[in-house]
Amino acid sequence: MLRKTNLSNITTLLRSARCMNRMPQLRFEHTKGDLKRVNRSYETRDAMLARLKYQSRKRGILETDLLLSNFAKDQIDKYPVSLLREYDQLLDEPDWDILYWCSGEREAPEKWKSSQVFKELSKYCRSQRNHTLRMPELF
């Protein structure tokens, strides 16, 4: 069965869940050196594209999966390697943070406010608010 959701409903659900104290305010604190980045300097552009599309699709939170997988399908094929690396770094952020930042629920950190990839993702999120999203086809 295909799952569908509407991004404008996501924002409403997030707000109502917080108002009813069903969902805690999630805060993720990162300390330097938490995660070691995998050395992918050997990775070809095609391999990087395939990996990023997969990682965009398999996040863990359906709403973020839908947003990122559709964004990746529509946008990242045209990115140069430098922007693909930037998108790769964005995918290292927690799902809830990405969703809150893109939906405007929370202010994004300065690092991402100035990011071209994040600006395009936020614009994409706003443009999809009234659309029903579904997972893109794998092939």
Swiss-Prot record:
Transit peptide location: 1-28
Q: Which gene encodes it?
A: emi5
Asked whether the UniProt record includes Chaperone among its keywords, one would answer: yes
Kindly state which keywords UniProt assigns to this record, in alphabetical order: Chaperone, Mitochondrion, Transit peptide
Gene Ontology BP, a term: mitochondrial electron transport, succinate to ubiquinone
| Gene source species | Schizosaccharomyces pombe (strain 972 / ATCC 24843)
The family annotation for this protein states: Belongs to the SDHAF2 family.
Q: Which domain of life is it from?
A: Eukaryota
Q: What is this protein called?
A: Succinate dehydrogenase assembly factor 2, mitochondrial
